[in-house]
A protein has these predicted regions:
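FAD-binding core/adjacent interface of flavoenzyme oxidoreductases
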Residues: 1-4, 64-156, 211, 222-238
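Rossmann-like dinucleotide-binding cores of NAD(P)H-dependent redox enzymes
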Residues: 59, 152-153, 160-215
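Single conserved hydrophobic/aromatic residue that forms the stacking wall/gate
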Residues: 235, 239-247
């Protein structure tokens, strides 16, 4: 039995380990387009904030671990670019060498997780705009903070990871503005809990803008859908961060 798994974060590596426990003789291969595997997404903001000092703590199980413990081959920085379910054939690209090759499977597991929603906003490709989806994103954000010493940040969206980022930015004494398109923060919470959370954040100095969205990102300001602006006190002092699903 040849089992191929696409994705090597939480679901993919868990599926691979379970498959090995069920079958001692199966050939198991995981393809992952990033270079980090089996990491804790919930821990990413706490690396940014310094609560987790060593980023390797987020990735305790590497390629060698899965090979030695489970005899599972993990191919990092390999992207599956097409699947032919009739022929059970995959087309894979090695992102390091640009080599494209075929592989086959008997059983296929899709464990690719979520992808960041990137809205069509002018300026979203600027260097001080970030998404938080994986370990590499966390590295980039932390490096930006340490190198540029920003004093202000904008968080677009009020998902749970965004709030963890908010807490982490407080460790750097960064003033934070939250922009939420809905008429209340944390749309999944009941109104009483959302109001309680909002009041608590406001008391702690967080500025919250509801029922609005970001229309344009410039070097020194953000233009909102209601035509108001969010100013920065110097160039590159905004860190725009989202958790990759909710913008």
């Amino acid at each position: 039995m040849r089992i191929v798994i696409i994705g090597a974060v939480a679901a993919g590596t868990s599926a691979a380990a379970k498959a090995r426990r069920n079958d001692d003789f199966a050939e198991i291969v995981i393809y992952e387009r990033d270079k980090d595997i089996s990491y804790s997404g919930c821990g990413l903001p706490y690396y940014i904030g310094g609560d987790i000092e060593d980023i390797n703590e987020l990735t305790p199980r590497d390629v060698k671990f899965f090979k030695d413990k489970y005899d599972i081959e993990v191919k990092i920085q390999h992207e599956v670019i097409s699947v032919d379910p009739d022929k059970k054939v995959l087309i894979i690209k090695n992102l390091l060498t640009d080599e494209v090759f075929e592989d086959h499977y008997e059983k296929l597991v899709l464990a690719t997780g979520a992808s960041p929603f990137i809205p069509k906003i002018e300026g979203i490709d600027k260097k001080h705009v970030f998404f938080l989806r994986n370990v590499e994103n966390a590295r980039d954000i932390k490096s930006f903070i340490e190198e540029n010493k920003p004093t202000k940040a904008v968080i677009a969206g009020t998902g749970f990871i965004g709030f963890e980022v908010l807490e982490s930015l407080a460790n750097y004494s960064i003033d934070v503005t939250i922009v939420e398109v809905a008429d209340k923060i944390t749309p999944n919470l009941d109104i009483d809990m959302a109001n309680f959370l909002e009041n608590t954040l406001v008391k702690k100095g967080v500025k919250i803008l509801k029922s609005t969205s970001i229309n344009k990102i410039l070097d020194k300001e953000i233009i909102l859908s209601n035509e108001n602006t969010i100013d920065a006190d110097r160039k590159s002092t905004r860190l725009n961060s989202s958790h990759g699903i909710i913008w």
